[in-house]
Curated annotation (Swiss-Prot):
Residues 386-502 form the PI-PLC Y-box domain. GO terms for molecular function: calcium ion binding; phosphatidylinositol-3-phosphate binding; phosphatidylinositol-4,5-bisphosphate binding; phosphatidylinositol-4,5-bisphosphate phospholipase C activity; phosphatidylinositol-5-phosphate binding; phospholipase C activity. This is 1-phosphatidylinositol 4,5-bisphosphate phosphodiesterase zeta-1. SMART domains: C2, PLCXc, PLCYc. Keywords: Calcium, Cytoplasm, Developmental protein, Fertilization, Hydrolase, Lipid degradation, Lipid metabolism, Nucleus, Transducer.
Length: 647
């Protein structure tokens, strides 16, 4: 009897929602599409057309209310959702409050759930008032809950800034872009303000500005010696000022590639000061005279990264003085060992360092006399006004690890090209991690990438490089990893590096085949696909799901499902995969949906989603999908089950 009452209540509710649209008798496919949205179940029009055609029995392009209900049930009352619902109900019609709590604790691992939480879920998602009033949930409410943001794969607490933000800047991975002003290739592509706006909205915290002398004493931004278009420096700065803290409160670093004359450098300094005002960091913080401040201490601050002459104390003493026309000579004395990248065992390295220190104390000018050390000089004129705006991010050429350990100051940052960084990460891994534990290190794409392609950033995160700069305008795997990694910590653009990359006494080596420190065993069941994107080449694509793990080399693995033929609307797999992840703190997981097109043409990417392994919820979860360009493809998603434990 109770079951029949609930069925009647559900029928009355459904009729009340749709009957007005059927006053004319039948509806077409466009109204069907809108009505599904009205019922809180938006659907891709391509899928609506397909299901509409299957249910239009008379092939008139119009359907009855019964035919619409069949379409609605096909979309909402999915078999895999109904099976879960039935497992926790006695009559397969209604989920009690206690049964909902049982489901949430046993299946979703919501261990702190209580009656007030379950009532809140019922009130939020149950659309049938009679059922809601009894603190129960129908399949309608349960389906709405399972398809809601609360059941997404990404952990809710990872959507907030939950990490300790009081460590020095060098203790964080920092979301960084390369050639931010470009929105295409590096030879003919246009420069555009949108490059900066888009990067900042995505949470990027380090922007590159390539500055050159312009006409009428107006510095310009473009990729020098190419045919890329030009932007006014002041226009770029104004855009940054508007969007700098829209997504994140934490500091923005402006990495200046400065090719300007002293006169136009002075103009740059004036523009920076007048535009940013108090947001521009122009003096050291009192509590951080000789150590890097934290992101928390630098909230809402703009930092300038550029060459600098003199010390922070000298800069402090000049505050308030007139610097017009004053030019400083920047000198770079480069000491290089003969074979920079050759391996050096720790004992030999310590002897080498001791020798440098002894020579330095005795007579700095004799350093070049050490066997194997070469010396050369470089000079450049810098406007004092611009030099004095560089505080905690002084650009300093990277010579080698030995030199940095002896000479490098706490506020000096290095930029290393990808090829050299890759070589160092393989041959000098311990020294590299020791270096990045102390100094901010930026890795940038090699010059040969004229098409603005990117490298895999994971290999440099593995050795602690803070600023792994990518071409944000170029979609693909590297940017998927970038976007996925920086979803963490509230999308703030700052992620605290794990202990193994901050504490050098741990002796971490990402290249070791095994790292026995509480690995994670991860099990994922790919259950089904929900309204997957339609292929550009076929309305009935053959779908495959690929799971990829990126992290230290030993954790890099790829597994895939079987191919489901001719079904993008609701393909089903029910396939289980297990992964052993040695260093989960550095691991990202990527879900890829492709359509199989044959050996010659290759697979077509339909959607993907990347996130940190430790940001995954357990239980039945929905994986949102994003296009190659990063567009959200909702309601396209995967329905999966996740379980993992740490040894």
């Amino acid at each position: 009897m109770e079951s029949q009452l609930h069925e009647l209540a559900e029928a009355r509710w459904f009729l009340s929602k749709v009957q007005d649209d059927f006053r004319g008798g039948k509806i077409n496919v466009e109204i069907t599409h809108k009505l599904l949205e009205k019922l809180d179940f938006p659907c891709h029009f391509a899928h609506v057309k397909h299901i509409f055609k299957e249910n239009d029995r008379q092939n008139q392009g119009r359907i009855t209310i019964e035919e619409f209900r069949a379409i609605y049930r096909c979309i909402v009352h999915r078999e895999e959702i109904t099976e879960i619902f039935n497992t926790y109900t006695e009559n397969r019609k209604i989920l009690s409050e206690n049964s909902l709590i049982e489901f949430l604790t046993q299946e979703q691992y919501e261990m702190e759930i209580d009656h007030s939480d379950s009532v809140e879920i019922i009130n939020k998602y149950e659309p049938i008032e009679e059922v809601k009033g009894e603190r129960q949930m129908s399949i309608e409410g349960f389906a709405r809950y399972m398809f809601s943001s609360e059941c997404l794969l990404f952990k809710e607490n990872c959507k907030t800034v939950y990490q300790d933000m009081n460590h020095p800047l060098s203790d964080y991975f920092i979301s960084s872009s390369h050639n931010t002003y470009l929105i295409s290739d590096q030879i003919l592509g246009p420069s555009d303000i949108w490059g900066y706006v888009s990067a900042l909205v995505k949470g990027c915290r380090c922007l590159e500005i390539d500055c050159w002398d312009g006409s009428q004493n107006e510095p310009i931004v473009y990729h020098g010696y190419t045919f890329t278009s030009k932007l006014l420096f002041k226009t770029v700065v104004q855009a940054i000022n508007k969007y700098a803290f829209v997504t994140s409160d934490y500091p923005v670093v402006l990495s200046l590639e400065n090719h300007c004359s002293p006169g136009q450098q002075e103009v740059m300094a004036s523009i920076l000061q007048s535009t940013f005002g108090d947001f521009l960091l122009s003096d050291m913080l009192e509590e951080f005279p000789d150590t890097l401040p934290s992101p928390e201490a630098l909230k809402f601050k703009i930092l300038v990264k550029n060459r600098k002459v003199g010390t922070l104390s000298e800069t402090h003493e000049r505050i308030g003085t007139d610097k017009s026309g004053q030019v400083l000579e920047w000198k770079e004395v480069i000491y290089e060992d003969g074979d920079e990248d050759s391996g050096m065992d720790p004992e030999t390295w310590d002897v080498f360092l001791s020798r440098i220190k002894e020579e330095r104390e005795a007579d700095p000018s004799t350093l070049s006399g050490i066997a194997g050390v070469k010396k050369r000089k470089r000079k450049m004129k810098i406007a004092m006004a611009l030099s004095d705006l560089v505080i905690y991010t002084k650009a300093e050429k990277f010579r080698n690890f030995q030199y940095s350990r002896v000479y490098q100051q706490f506020n000096e940052t290095n930029s290393i090209g990808e090829s050299r960084a890759r070589k160092l990460s393989k041959l000098r891994v311990h020294e590299f991690i020791f270096h990045t534990a102390a100094f901010i290190t930026r890795v940038y794409p090699k010059m040969m990438r004229a098409d603005s392609s990117n490298f895999n950033p994971q290999e440099f995160w593995n050795v602690g490089c803070q600023m792994v700069a990518l071409n944000f305008q170029t979609p693909g795997l590297p940017m998927d990893l970038q976007n996925g990694k920086f979803l963490d910590n509230g999308g703030s653009g700052y992620i605290l590096k794990p202990d193994i990359l901050r504490d050098t006494t741990l002796g971490f080596n990402p290249n070791e085949p095994e790292y026995d420190d509480h690995p994670v065993t991860l099990t994922i069941r790919i259950i089904s696909g929900i309204q997957l994107p339609v292929s550009s080449s076929s309305n009935t694509p053959d779908i495959v799901v690929i799971i990829e793990v990126y992290g230290v080399p030993n954790d890099h693995v790829k597994q895939q499902t079987r191919v489901v033929k001719n079904n993008a609307f609701s393909p089903k797999w029910n396939e289980t995969f297990t992964f052993l992840i040695q260093v989960p703190e550095l691991a990202l997981i990527r879900f890829v949906v492709e359509t199989q097109q044959g050996l010659l043409s290759g697979n077509e990417l339909l959607g993907q989603y990347t996130l940190p392994v430790l940001c995954m919820n357990k239980g039945y979860r929905r994986v949102p999908l994003f296009s190659k360009s990063g567009a959200n493809l909702e309601p396209s998603s995967l329905f999966i089950y996740v379980w993992y434990f740490r040894e």
